[in-house]
Amino acid sequence: MSSKYAVKLKTDFDNPRWIKRHKHMFDFLDINGNGKITLDEIVSKASDDICAKLEATPEQTKRHQVCVEAFFRGCGMEYGKEIAFPQFLDGWKQLATSELKKWARNEPTLIREWGDAVFDIFDKDGSGTITLDEWKAYGKISGISPSQEDCEATFRHCDLDNSGDLDVDEMTRQHLGFWYTLDPEADGLYGNGVP
């Protein structure tokens, strides 16, 4: 799966910003606030909460769930297995390393497959791209970009071709750079919502 967008491939796992970014996500995913997360919590949020509120079809929800499971299993997570932040961070390091190798070889990545599944849900008009309004609906429902300003910042960061719409390739590139490598082109991806 080839992308027309380059991304920084060198990781910076010891950078305090990278660690803080993933701690923020860990805390966001820790639904019951016990300092540990499970794949159960993540799938519940993704399928029972987000997909339901976005009015995904049963087929879209199943496809999305399969992608969420594969992605977080890539981080070493499993149903019924609690992990604390240090294990979560180690899992992200393994996932990022594997994903970046795939990206460099133009092979499908888990983040792209998840992106394809989620775009199918976001793209209410079937255009193959998402609009700012479609992104704002997701940001509000998911809680990842709770303010209009944060949604707009994400949209601007991801609109690499300045078309006014986002395609899955643009979104994947920016998320890969943001979550995996601290690529400066992706800094501020979620506005003030995520460090």
UniProtKB/Swiss-Prot annotation:
Return the PANTHER family for the record: CALCIUM BINDING PROTEIN
> What are the alphabetically sorted keywords of the record?
Calcium, Luminescence, Metal-binding, Photoprotein, Repeat
Q: Which residues bind Ca(2+) 3?
A: D159, D161, S163, D165, E170
Q: Mind telling me which SUPFAM superfamilies this protein's record contains? A: EF-hand
Q: Which CDD domains match?
A: EFh (cd00051)
Stretches assigned to the EF-hand domain: 17-52, 53-88, 110-145, 146-181
Q: Which Pfam families match?
A: EF-hand_5, EF-hand_7
Keyword Repeat listed: yes
Protein name per UniProt: Obelin
Q: Name one GO molecular function term.
A: calcium ion binding
Q: Which residues bind Ca(2+) 2?
A: D123, D125, S127, T129, E134
> Which residues does the propeptide include?
1-6
Alphabetical GO biological process terms: bioluminescence
Task: Report the family membership.
Answer: Belongs to the aequorin family.
> What does the UniProt function comment say about this protein?
Ca(2+)-dependent bioluminescence photoprotein. Displays an emission peak at 470 nm (blue light). Trace amounts of calcium ion trigger the intramolecular oxidation of the chromophore, coelenterazine into coelenteramide and CO(2) with the concomitant emission of light.
Name the reported effect of W92F.
Answer: Shifts luminescence to violet by adding a new band at 410 nm
Tell me which domain of life the UniProt entry assigns to the organism this sequence originates from: Eukaryota
Binding residues annotated for Ca(2+) 1, in chain numbering: D30, N32, N34, K36, E41
